[in-house]
Curated annotation (Swiss-Prot):
The organism's taxonomic lineage, starting at the top: Viruses, Varidnaviria, Bamfordvirae, Nucleocytoviricota, Megaviricetes
UniProt name for this protein: Uncharacterized protein L216
Domain of life of the source: Viruses
Amino acid sequence: MEIVSELRKAFNNNDIEKIKSNINIHYILLLKWSIYSGNDDMFHLILNTKILTKSEEIDWFFIYATILNRINIVKSILEYSTRDSSTINYASKISASIGNYDMIYVIYLQ
């Protein structure tokens, strides 16, 4: 648990070196934090450093960013890899249900 609290402190302080040294082990946690906080720069750093290979991981981050209305992060994920139509439709339905029509526009036109 101590490493997580140190990592959180590094994340909050944008300590790039500390983040980079822990990306391979804690990249899922770091991606969640960056989406939740809306830290686009940190999200890009992690996404460009750690190759995500599992489609379900990418889908989860895509949906999570959609729910939290992180338009720049959604754009980044769509640029990073193409999502299948069922994931796109699900994200669009979520966006429509919360009245986020800007996100629907981004999802379909990206």
